[in-house]
């Protein structure tokens, strides 16, 4: 049986019903990218679609990113967890969506972080300052330890996704399903997320590099800190969001969405014995690409067609924060009040109000600014297919129409 067949069998085992109607602590990751025009220049391939960019990048590193953590996903322990997850089919628990996304990578590309780590490892190549590094085993231009790091990065990210799929029982409504189903799903989410983190910690220890352990440990700490800040700043429906500026937003976003990729890219350079300058450029690429990607995701409700106008959006997203910053706190609160209808916030009306201001265009400019910073960091790496693929990823996340 092929690896693809194994993955499809696992997805079928988890059930084929649609996604749950409501998520609680689940967040959008580096998954959904729009395709539109670029600004700074074009890569040699000038990619038009996100899936095309990812597919070409996977060919360069040797295998699809969705297979990177396959050894963990097909372990006996996780097979037992999958049997328990199957019991959640039909309950609408967010854990089901995460599980399906892990095996249906064609649409969601949850494992982008590991792919970027492999690409930047190949783009940098072996270190010229340490001859001992030349003796390490290398496949498709990437050391085995760097491939292990890519898997570890994905395990950490996936564990966070699973943990953030926990249902907030205090906000549970009768329409969400029986309480016992949600409690059971929460237990499985906690245990399976902990299992993935344990595998990541074991993999880190096997790398036998204390600096890499320190980098990934600090990235995990940043993630937890960032998620805590997001949960503290998150607002219930129809309530006034916190008063934060774009500088504070960027600090929080770095912790929750950028730190893992940035420090994993730096760790990949450390494993290949590159000097501090190369490590810093890898860090800067990961940081700014992830930041640009997050802003792109925040912009989607404001640049898509009217089919999505009825949907809600995050009142602490980049375009909204910038809109409030330009407008002033008092006028922003007034606009929220004007968008209230029968005790409920009319997101369609508020969206049009925000689109009429400067927040959306400023967010697009900010997205492109960070994209430019990511491209500048890549200039320190020699020209190669891997570097072009990294550039294509930046072009894809900074294109709008």
UniProtKB/Swiss-Prot annotation:
It is found in: Mitochondrion. GO terms for biological process: cerebellum development; isoprenoid biosynthetic process; regulation of body fluid levels; ubiquinone biosynthetic process. Keywords: Isoprene biosynthesis, Lipid metabolism, Mitochondrion, Transferase, Ubiquinone biosynthesis. It catalyses: 7 isopentenyl diphosphate + (2E,6E)-farnesyl diphosphate = all-trans-decaprenyl diphosphate + 7 diphosphate; 6 isopentenyl diphosphate + (2E,6E)-farnesyl diphosphate = all-trans-nonaprenyl diphosphate + 6 diphosphate. InterPro entries: Isoprenoid_synthase_dom_sf, Polyprenyl_synt. Pathway: Cofactor biosynthesis; ubiquinone biosynthesis. GO terms for molecular function: all-trans-decaprenyl-diphosphate synthase activity; protein heterodimerization activity. Disruption phenotype: Homozygous mice for PDSS2 are embryonic lethal. The oldest PDSS2 embryo identified is at E9.5, and its morphology resembles normal E6.5 mouse embryo, so the development of mutant embryo may be blocked at late gastrula stage. Conditional knockout mice lacking PDSS2 in cerebellum show severe cerebellum hypoplasia during cerebellum development, whereas conditional knockout mice lacking PDSS2 in Purkinje cells at postnatal stages leads to the development of cerebellar ataxia. Its EC number is 2.5.1.91. GO terms for cellular component: cytosol; heterotetrameric polyprenyl diphosphate synthase complex; mitochondrion; transferase complex; ubiquinone biosynthesis complex. Heterotetramer composed of 2 PDSS1/DPS1 and 2 PDSS2/DLP1 subunits. Heterotetrameric enzyme that catalyzes the condensation of farnesyl diphosphate (FPP), which acts as a primer, and isopentenyl diphosphate (IPP) to produce prenyl diphosphates of varying chain lengths and participates in the determination of the side chain of ubiquinone. Supplies nona and decaprenyl diphosphate, the precursors for the side chain of the isoprenoid quinones ubiquinone-9 (Q9) and ubiquinone-10 (Q10) respectively. The enzyme adds isopentenyl diphosphate molecules sequentially to farnesyl diphosphate with trans stereochemistry. May play a role during cerebellar development. PANTHER family: ALL TRANS-POLYPRENYL-DIPHOSPHATE SYNTHASE PDSS2, GERANYLGERANYL PYROPHOSPHATE SYNTHASE. Belongs to the FPP/GGPP synthase family. This is All trans-polyprenyl-diphosphate synthase PDSS2. It comes from Mus musculus (Mouse). The lineage of its organism: Eukaryota, Metazoa, Chordata, Craniata, Vertebrata.
